[in-house]
């Protein structure tokens, strides 16, 4: 019996593969436990169209991330912090500060988990990296100024 694996099966193969197995194994275990579906032409056609849609969605998301990366090139965001002697900050600039400044000043919303922030203990200009999905990265600058 031909089956389409829905989930990875250790001794058989990975999700998305079509395999030939014995009827009993397919019906009593793989299909019953939700690891596979019978590989009818309709099931295979639906699976292929779903894969194409997912690939198209992924391409669209990569394009939008690249556009965001290009938008952030050359951007500088100002962040005001309290300053003590020797231009040292009270505390440091956090990922929240950077995300909020980007939203307020440039109207760009970024998840703070994506921000890679260097240690900021004094006023000055710092490079900030964003690690987006699919290996796309972005760089921009923050300028830390005293209040």
Curated annotation (Swiss-Prot):
Keyword Ribosomal protein among UniProt keywords: yes
A biological-process GO annotation: translation
GO molecular function: rRNA binding; structural constituent of ribosome
InterPro entries membership: Ribosomal_bL9, Ribosomal_bL9/RNase_H1_N, Ribosomal_bL9_bac/chp, Ribosomal_bL9_C, Ribosomal_bL9_C_sf, Ribosomal_bL9_N, Ribosomal_bL9_N_sf
Keywords: Ribonucleoprotein, Ribosomal protein, RNA-binding, rRNA-binding
GO cellular component, one term: ribonucleoprotein complex
Similarity field: Belongs to the bacterial ribosomal protein bL9 family.
NCBIfam families for this protein: L9
General function of this protein: Binds to the 23S rRNA.
The name this protein goes by in its record: Large ribosomal subunit protein bL9
Organism name: Campylobacter hominis (strain ATCC BAA-381 / DSM 21671 / CCUG 45161 / LMG 19568 / NCTC 13146 / CH001A)
